[in-house]
Amino acid sequence: MLGKYTAKNDKDPDGNPHGGTVVGLGINIEWQKGPLGTGMARKEPNGAFVETVIDAARQRIQFYQDSKFKCRENAIAITKLEEALMWLNKRTAGRDARGVEGTHEK
């Protein structure tokens, strides 16, 4: 069941993603504000990352899949969430290889 939620996506003065929120029944997400930086200047996260939220949903569906509610649809949903994580990790690896991970550079 898709519940109602409100989302607010914030931008910095340059138009870059800069945090935001998602709030609904049982949900209260505060997104990462700004880049983490690189090297010695790398900061601790101050908010959630999309990958973490996707993985949290994946583990919950896996919980159902490991119970009497096991079904084909759950298995497919898990696969698709794992695929989403794979693509996001591929993006991060590419950014690492280009030396721009943790920055607003492309």
Residue ranges and their predicted role:
Residues 10-14, 55, 66, 96:
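Acidic-enriched, low-complexity/disordered segments with a strong bias for Aspartate over Glutamate
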Residues 1-49, 104-106:
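Long, non-catalytic architectural segments outside compact domain cores
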Residues 46-63:
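Short acidic, glycine/tyrosine-flanked loop/strand segments centered on an H-E-D-like triad
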